Regions:
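Substrate-binding cleft of extracellular glycoside hydrolase catalytic domains
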Residues: 75-201, 207-209
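Structural recognition of alpha->loop->beta junctions
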Residues: 162-176, 180, 226-250
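Functionally critical loop-and-helix segments that line ligand-binding/catalytic clefts
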Residues: 49-87, 231-281
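Aromatic-lined carbohydrate-recognition surfaces of secreted/lumenal glycan-active proteins
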Residues: 206-224
Length: 281
């Protein structure tokens, strides 16, 4: 009988030791997982994601335009005609262009190469074009041909543009002109989020420097590669060729052809219409 009691006591002692060891292990685990002063906290409420309104609908339609004297014209309200130029146009006679109806010009001041190096370069004719257009009494804006793939590059382009237009008295915006080149270009895999951020970075920097900024794009780019609702603080310049004006959103400038003929400008000319804001009927 005593031996049985001794055995029972021994088993009880072993059980107590095992339970104590288990409790010790559990305590250690709690301390490791939740160190003192680092108790679990309820998740902090997050701010709702910003929402953006869609761009304003386009108040212009196909019925507002017709050909007049060889050029597309808005026949239902005021408008003005202009061109955009780069060094590839060679020597320009601005007086002849003005007499043909051109009232404004956007001058390319520089660009970034679409090869992998992505080098920045100035337009060799920009200063000459600026002085000639100003002397002829035309309104002048500027544009930069971008191939940025990051916000850092877009800011580099903005600062480069500001250096190139230093001393210019611009009447019109400084334009961010990012274009898809081809499948082998450094920009071929840029996503909409990346390009929208690049566009905002460039335009914000231009605006912060005291200039008006504007965004240039074509129909497919505006649909697939830009979140236009995030860019509505800046005016839009749309490239839509050989087509009636049926774009859904309001644009301030419409580049309606790449193959125009303008006296004083050698070769093909990009022709644009400036369309004033007006109420939707």
């Amino acid at each position: 009988m005593l031996k049985k009691q001794d055995g029972d006591l021994l088993q009880l002692e072993i059980l107590m030791i095992v339970l104590g060891a288990v409790l010790l292990v559990l305590c250690i685990l709690v301390i490791v997982i939740f160190p003192p002063g680092d108790t679990p906290k309820a998740p902090e409420p997050t701010e709702p994601a910003p929402t953006f309104a869609a761009p304003e609908p386009n108040p212009y339609g196909p019925e507002d335009f017709a050909e007049v004297n060889g050029y597309l014209a808005c026949v239902t309200g005021p408008y003005s005609m202009g061109v955009d130029v780069s060094e590839f146009h060679g020597a320009i006679n601005w007086e002849k262009a003005k007499n043909a109806g051109v009232s404004f010009v956007f001058i390319r001041v520089g660009g970034r190469g679409w090869g992998q190096e992505g080098r920045l370069y100035p337009d060799s004719k920009a200063q000459e074009y600026y002085e000639g257009a100003k002397a002829a009494g035309l309104q002048v804006g500027a544009y930069f041909f971008s191939q940025a793939v990051t916000v850092t590059e877009a800011l580099e382009e903005a600062n480069y543009t500001l250096d190139l237009i230093e001393g210019w008295e611009l009447d019109l915006p400084v334009v961010y002109d990012w274009e898809y080149v081809n499948a082998s270009a450094r920009t071929a895999k840029v996503r909409a989020r990346d390009l929208t951020d690049c566009t905002l970075a460039f335009c914000d920097a231009i605006q912060d420097a005291g200039h008006e900024a504007m965004v240039y794009f074509n129909v497919s780019q505006g649909r697939d590669l830009l979140y236009l609702e995030e860019l509505t603080i800046y005016p839009f310049w749309l490239a839509m060729y050989e087509s009636p004006m049926n774009y859904q959103y309001e644009v301030e400038y419409w580049q309606y052809t790449r193959f125009g003929s303008v006296p004083g400008i050698p070769g093909n000319a990009d022709i644009n219409l400036r369309l004033p804001k007006r109420p939707i009927v």
